[in-house]
Amino acid sequence: VFCRFNGQQCTSDGQCCYGKCRTAFLRMICMGG
């Protein structure tokens, strides 16, 4: 399973390497860590 880094767009299930999938700039991106 691949994951997305901070600043990359994510899906509602939140496949982020670290941090969480949050709404920003009218889209979902990975933020935090």
From Swiss-Prot:
Xref: Pfam families: Toxin_29 (PF08116)
A GO CC term assigned to this protein in UniProt: extracellular region
Tissues of expression: Expressed by the venom gland.
Subcellular location field: Secreted
Disulfide pairings: 3-17, 10-21, 16-30
GO molecular function, one term: toxin activity
Keywords associated with the record: Disulfide bond, Knottin, Neurotoxin, Secreted, Toxin
Main location: secreted
UniProt domain comment: The presence of a 'disulfide through disulfide knot' structurally defines this protein as a knottin.
Function: Acts as a neurotoxin.
Protein name: U13-ctenitoxin-Pn1c
Organism: Phoneutria nigriventer
Taxonomic lineage: Eukaryota, Metazoa, Ecdysozoa, Arthropoda, Chelicerata
